[in-house]
């Protein structure tokens, strides 16, 4: 009940944001949280950003979400990003730029799965520690696929239990925990996404990170060539 109450408060405080990652509104990125079903597109999806989720420019004006709605998915080169507070990437088993081949081994701390084909996608990770926002709780991890993503395909991204610089496990978000641990909630925003996210968790488990070991998993659809 305590977990559900905390998650409900998170959803209520930022209804336009993704409750899977409490630190950044649009994270993890890119995500099906900001897609909608659309039977008239090639992918069956289109981008759908609530106005309240859009970043604000230097003039204090929110970016207009409307132009994005013309896309039936995300660009093939869209950066894949997630916030992992104070993570030690090496100790967490994240594949490095020097050795990206480990990203398709079962011991990899991150996985990208092409849900259209079932194939794992080789990639490397980069920790973005910019000094101007060098706060431990704002550590951004980027996943860089070695090849361009396939137009029209749906992808899953998974992160195994990461550890911080002291070797301590970094706590999982309330939002992902209720999905991973199959904890039913009375929160509509959560339950509406449960079925889709369950598919993602299962795909990540099949790709080598067991359900109980998952720290975060999400999905997104790449735009079609016809878009």
Which sequence ranges carry the predicted segments?
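Acidic, low-complexity Ser/Thr/Gly/Pro-rich repeat segments typical of extracellular/periplasmic
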Residues: 2-227
